[in-house]
From Swiss-Prot:
Occurrences of domain HTH luxR-type (ranges): 829-894
Keyword Transcription regulation found: yes
Species lineage: Bacteria, Pseudomonadati, Pseudomonadota, Gammaproteobacteria, Enterobacterales
Protein name: HTH-type transcriptional regulator MalT
Region entry DT1, spans: 1-241
Gene name for this UniProt entry: malT
Length: 901
């Protein structure tokens, strides 16, 4: 819940001097990306901008405090301020900020700018007290904001120092409007206006000018002088002389003498007690100070000029001038030290009553009241956890004694989930083990089941499926039906375990159950996870179309619940890329992989390994080895600088081994084969993939016998576990083994099986990457004209893809080849006496490669009628009548020249 006062522009007060010269400068603010107002405390920055903002509608205001260094809190308030300025135009961003469903501030801002592209009016966003921001991530994100904000948006930043926002660059590009302390300092005329408004007896212009010069036009000093003069403690000029040369850090003594010592004791205590509140309203004041009418007291303090300012148009929320507020808080610690814990407790209770638990926690921590802090956490911690208030929760839990956590195991569980969310898996188990050892009777308690559900999640994340299965089953046996979150976790883990063990049908059923429960209870990240797992399972079973449809449901969920920036989104677009690649939709597959990298742009580069491997797969399928090599350099660098799950390594190794196969790099393959992991089992698609990598490397090295043993065992496992996509891949690799070993009939047999199975999987690119060896076999099958219709169609499609992406494969009939052919002693006499033109040789090569007349015309960029003429001349010179005869003739020529066909 957001505090309204932080989003309210300060009310323009009566008796303030209208800064006409500065307002004139600000009137052109819409021509700049950034308007920067900087000065030490008390120069009137906020007052000036509130005057400028008066009457403007398209403006959002965000007043910062120290707590806004939390990225999630900063994001929530900033987006809320934009919503205020646009009347709720950016609904998607608002939902993402509220639910913390974004990968980083920069990615959230990128989405914001997409939505603002439809907002065409001038727009202003004011951020007050930016000097309070010390978080470098927020600074970097705001630099991104300024670089990419729409042209019609102006950011207005108020700060006591020069913020780290790339100011120099903006200044050089004339995109910065600056107002500093010298311009903010009051002129003689403004000082005279100020005193005329504040003092019952006007002072002479010359006297006013001298006072203004004595304090260098510092607005706070002028206000203190006016206050002192009204209280008749000193003359205005005497006060001015005392303040001359003083800066904000040396005001304490003066404020004690001239303000606190000149109010009655009740007012003094009111000021000191109320100052602990960063913002205040009637209810807070009544509870903290004991005053019966808080609103009336606040208005009275405001009338006395005691540096209190309204924060909203309704006059409900107030705050002290930052300079005076800091002074009062320091004095409160000295003068009311004994009462201070009770004052903070009162503030916490009042904030809780108004529904602001995070503010209440701030005061409970300040009070050092562990019992109050415990009670707040017991009632609100899980809500704060689900809203990603992780740093606040961590600080709170650290403040509680261990005994308090033991008495409330829910808080131990919360602390463990915090660790799990930060991938501190070892610490999770240590914490839970210690708690279970010390909590009496917990093993008979439902809490023990919740512990086990979390432990199961940690175990599966840490690559220990057997332990995860044991713990998940224990949790499900012990958890009551109503404990939905832990039941969702345990069910999901059990489904993932079964997936790892190759029990796909049971795994699919559990993941569907997880999805249903997660949707019912609005646990959207587990709903998304279950859909992703379902898609992977269906892909492994060979049901790629159903996997596609499941992915569509996942994309719909992401859009509806604004989950675009969860890291899980990358998983979804990556498996979509894998599916598109299988179907030879390479441009779409590449775009999907790149979008996955974009989702992870704010994470460590190592997280991008899988998407990078997918990009390399696209390059390999296109036969673009130069691009593949460039990307492989980066992939191998990432592999050497990170720790990865075994299936990540397997996917990365896959593209490396295929590249070595395509380039004939036997040395690299042999070196890799000596050091790579050889899993004990092959009962899921992750392990099947690694063993397939091993077999491919063995085939490249001519180690056909061990490769055949591996592939036959893989096929046996794949058939028994119904891993149909893996079976399809294995058959293709076995085909290459047989082909290279000269076992042509075996090669044809498994290729026919692979083509038949591809009717179910839809595989295209898995055939294409095998290159010319695959093309030669498919040409022969097509020429035999014995394939069933579906397989015939697929074979022709695969051949077209090979020809399109591996054009060097049909370059046998280039000029050098033809010259060598004509000089060969066994060349047919007909070719010697009626030589083909270079164009006719090109056409023969394309016919042999399986191109249709239309495709040949497109390849050579000539009319189809021209191609028909070339073919007629070609047939006449070769003495053939049909295309199949021409293909056989070309095949004989290639064999004569020593090419294996």
């Amino acid at each position: 819940m957001l505090i309204p006062s932080k989003l309210s522009r300060p009310v323009r007060l009566d008796h303030t001097v209208v800064r006409e010269r500065l307002l004139a400068k600000l009137s052109g603010a819409n021509n700049f990306r950034l308007a920067l107002i900087t000065s030490p405390a008390g120069y009137g920055k906020t007052t000036l901008i509130s005057q400028w903002a008066a009457g403007k509608n398209d403006i959002g205001w965000y007043s910062l405090d120290e707590g806004d260094n939390q990225q999630e809190r900063f994001a929530s308030y900033l987006i809320a301020a934009v919503q205020q300025a646009t009347n709720g135009h950016c609904a998607i961003c608002e939902t993402m900020a509220q639910k913390r469903q974004y990968a980083s501030l920069t990615s959230l801002f990128a989405q914001l700018f997409i939505e603002l592209a439809e907002w065409h009016s001038p727009l202003y966003l004011v951020i007050d007290d930016y000097h309070l921001i010390t978080n470098p991530v927020i600074h970097e994100s705001m630099r991104f904001f300024i670089r990419h904000q729409p042209e019609n948006l102006t950011l207005v930043v108020l700060s006591r120092n020069l913020p780290q926002l790339g100011i120099a660059n903006l200044r050089v590009r004339d995109q910065l409007l600056e107002i500093g302390s010298q311009q903010l300092a009051f002129t003689h005329q403004e000082a005279k206006q100020f005193f005329d408004c504040r003092l019952s007896s006007p002072i002479e212009a010359a006297e006013s000018s001298r006072i203004c010069d004595d304090v260098s036009g510092w607005a706070t000093a002028l206000q203190l002088i006016a206050l002192s003069a009204r209280q008749n403690t000193h003359s205005a000029h005497k006060s001015a002389r005392r303040l001359a040369g003083i800066n904000a850090s040396h005001l304490s003594d003066y404020l004690v003498d001239e303000v606190l010592d000149n109010v009655d004791l009740a007012t003094r205590h009111f000021l000191l007690k109320s100052a602990i509140l960063r913002s205040m309203n009637d209810a807070l004041i009544t509870r903290v100070t004991g005053e019966e009418n808080g609103q009336m007291r606040l208005e009275e303090i405001e009338r006395q000029g005691l540096f209190l300012q309204r924060m909203d148009d309704t006059g409900e929320w107030f705050c002290y001038h930052p300079l005076f507020g800091n002074f009062l808080r320091q004095r409160c610690q000295w003068e009311l030290a004994a009462e201070l814990p009770e004052i903070h407790r009162a503030a916490a209770e009042s904030w809780m009553a108004q529904g602001f638990p995070s503010e209440a926690i701030h005061h409970a921590l300040a009070a050092g009241d562990a019992l109050m802090l415990r009670d707040i956490l017991l009632n609100h911690a899980w809500s704060l956890f689900n809203h990603s208030e992780l740093s606040l929760l961590e600080e709170s839990l650290k403040a509680l004694p261990w005994d308090s956590l033991l008495e409330n195991p829910q808080l131990v569980l919360l602390q463990a989930w915090l660790m799990q969310s930060q991938h501190r898996y070892g610490e999770v188990n240590t914490l839970l083990a210690r708690a279970e050892h010390e909590i009496k009777d917990i093993r008979e308690d439902t809490m023990h089941a919740e512990f086990n559900a979390l432990r199961a999640q940690v175990a599966i994340n840490d690559g220990n499926p057997d332990e995860a299965e044991r713990l998940a089953k224990l949790a499900l046996e012990e958890l009551p039906p109503g404990w939905f979150y832990s039941r969702i976790v345990a069910t999901s883990v059990l489904g993932e375990v079964l997936h790892c063990k190759g029990e796909l049908t049971r795994s699919l059923a559990l993941m569907q159950q997880t999805e249903q429960m997660a949707r019912q209870h609005d646990v959207w990240h587990y709903a998304l996870w279950s859909l992703i797992q379902q898609s992977e399972i269906l892909f492994a079973q060979g049901f790629l179309q159903t996997a596609w449809e499941t992915q569509e449901k996942a994309f719909q969920l992401i859009n509806e619940q604004h989950l675009e920036q969860l890291p899980m989104h990358e998983f979804l677009v990556r498996i979509r890329a894998q599916l598109l690649w299988a179907w030879a939709r390479l441009d779409e597959a590449e775009a999907s992989a790149r979008s996955g990298i974009e989702v992870l742009s704010s994470y460590q580069p190592q997280q991008q390994l899988q998407c990078l491997a997918m990009l390399i797969q696209c390059s390999l399928a296109r036969g673009d080895l130069d691009n593949a090599r460039s990307q492989l350099n980066r992939l191998e660098n990432l592999l050497g600088n990170g720790k990865y799950h075994s299936d990540w390594i397997s996917n990365a190794n896959k593209v490396r081994v295929i590249y070595w196969q395509m380039t004939g790099d036997k040395a690299a393959a042999a070196n890799w084969l000596r050091h790579t992991a050889k899993p004990e089992f092959a009962n899921n698609h992750f392990l099947q993939g690694q063993w397939r990598n091993i077999a491919r490397a063995q085939i490249l090295l001519g180690e056909f016998e061990p490769a055949e043993i591996v592939l036959e065992e893989l096929n046996e496992n794949a058939r028994s576990l119904r891993l149909m996509s893996d079976l399809n891949r294995n058959l293709l690799l076995l085909n290459q083994l047989y082909w290279q070993a000269g076992r042509k009939s075996d090669a044809q047999r498994v290729l026919l099986d692979a083509l038949k199975l591809a009717n179910r999987t839809g595989f295209i690119s898995h055939f294409v990457i095998e290159g010319e060896a695959m093309a030669q076999q498919l040409r022969q099958l097509i020429q035999l004209n014995t394939l069933p219709e579906l397989e015939q169609h697929r074979a022709q499609r695969i051949l077209r893809e090979i020809n399109q992406h591996h054009r060097h494969k049909f370059a046998h009939f280039d000029e050098n080849f033809v010259e060598r052919l004509l000089n060969h002693p066994e060349v047919p006499e007909l070719i010697r006496t009626s030589p083909l033109t270079q164009r006719e040789w090109q056409v023969l090569g394309l016919i042999y490669s399986g191109y249709s007349n239309e495709q040949i015309a497109g390849e050579l960029e000539v009319a189809a009628t021209t191609i028909k003429t070339h073919i007629r001349n070609l047939y006449q010179k070769l003495g053939v009548a049909h295309r199949q005869d021409a293909v056989q003739h070309a095949q004989q020529l290639l064999k004569m020249m020593g090419y294996g066909v």
